[in-house]
Amino acid sequence: MKLSRGHHRYLTDSNGKVETQKLIKEEPWAQEVFEKLKQRTDRYADRGPEWLTSRLQMYWKTHATEVYIKGEYYDHAGGEKAPAPTAMNTGARSHATNYVRPKLEDLKPYQEDARGMYLANGTLEGSPYEWVNSRTTGNIIQSINVEILGIARDAAFLWWMTGEKKYADLAASVFDTYMTGIYYRNVPKDLNHGHQQTLVGMSSFEVIHEDAVNALVPLYDFLYDYLKTDKADKMDIYAGAFKKWADNIIDNGVPHNNWNLMQARYIMSIGMILESDASYPDKKGGEYYIDYVLNRSS
């Protein structure tokens, strides 16, 4: 499978901008969609990039490199202190929780507390707020981060379309913070030494639910030219984070039912936006991961 080695190449190519601009100019429905996207994104871009970035669920203070789980639940985080904040894994394999997922506007910036998360208990009268261990919060952490990454993806697209720097600044801040946080964090370790160790992902409890990848891949591709200039010293870190993610998705999972198909989409997406194998010392670039999906078995 041959791909263009230039960016953009994931959702569009070098001709896509002109075609999209023409569509927006000529079709009222396209103009309406585009304006609504701008309005939604401006709510955050106009606050400055740090507002949205600071709501990411990260180990802002401890910079934990190790996440420990017990079966299908989070247990604790620790390990050596990374040189930058690291990304939190979600609280449990199941979505079920008594607690209400807060809106982004209700989150405090740079929140990391040894007591866990401060959430409203939706099962009690008046929905009182409580400090709760992350293990009881289902997929709230992942849901928050995926929403933020989705906004950043939209900002990257808007920068590509308009050239407005506020969109690039927002997208780059979120992307850089989160991907650096993945790069410096390891795959979670199951203290029960059970089957869950073969399923767990970098952001979720199952490698088939690494939803963050769905936002990060197009974000990176739309923002590539900006990152290549503004974050040139971080490009190897971004590639390393993507490759760590893909490698873990290859290593984990189950050999039956539909897991292989669900894993393949993430691996293929990452392969499509990496550079050629020759660009990396380990020779694991776009061709390597695409070949793994098309011609090899994990």
Q: Predicted segment positions?
A:
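Extracellular glycan-targeting catalytic surfaces
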Residues: M1-P255, L261-S269, D291-S297
